[in-house]
Every structure is written in structure tokens, then in C-alpha cells.
């Protein structure tokens, strides 16, 4: 039974996901349905966490827009995601960057990976 479930899940995993980690700046292209039409919405920000594995793996992206911080969580293998672009690689020493929530402005910057 477990083998059947694993096999079905393996078929649904996406292969076009780039390698990204917490601290990286990413652009997430999300398919949004409004009424009867579908469009692609862009969400760019810093990955503050990545958790889970397999089909249930998620990542959270944080961005500050006009002084308001917005965090959005996405399923990595969701069909709603059109694509994920890595804009910048960041150098951090933590897996979960919750401390960024308390920082603002230049203090919230993350160093570039060399």
C-alpha cells in the first residue's frame, strides 16, 4: 500500500523547481483565477523558511511593500505555481529566518553569496 502511495506521489512531483534555500530572493509566478479568466501574478521576496518533504513541502516568502510586510506560503509542487525564479542567492546561517520579522530597513538586508 505504501509503495502505491509513494509511486503516485512521485508522479505528481514537479521537476522544474530550481534549487533555492532560505535567504534567497525569489520571484514566484502564481496562477490566479479571477472570474472566468486566469492570469499570472508575480510575488517577489526573501525565502524565510522551507519545510516538509514530498508533495507537502512548502516555503514562505516575505516582502515589504509600502511599509507593510506580507508573508505568503506556497506549496513547492503546486500546479498553481507557474514558475519560480531565483533572483539572488543569500548567505545566512539559519534555516528559519524568523528574526527578519523584527528587523526593518537596512538591518533586514541579507549578504550575497559569493
From Swiss-Prot:
SUPFAM superfamilies: Translation proteins SH3-like domain
Gene3D superfamilies, A to Z: 2.30.30.790
PROSITE patterns: RIBOSOMAL_L19
GO biological process, one term: translation
GO molecular function annotation: structural constituent of ribosome
A GO CC annotation given for this chain: cytosolic large ribosomal subunit
Family: Belongs to the bacterial ribosomal protein bL19 family.
Its job: This protein is located at the 30S-50S ribosomal subunit interface and may play a role in the structure and function of the aminoacyl-tRNA binding site.
PANTHER family membership: LARGE RIBOSOMAL SUBUNIT PROTEIN BL19M, RIBOSOMAL PROTEIN L19
Name the UniProt record assigns to this protein: Large ribosomal subunit protein bL19
Organism of this sequence: Heliobacterium modesticaldum (strain ATCC 51547 / Ice1)
Gene name, Swiss-Prot/TrEMBL: rplS
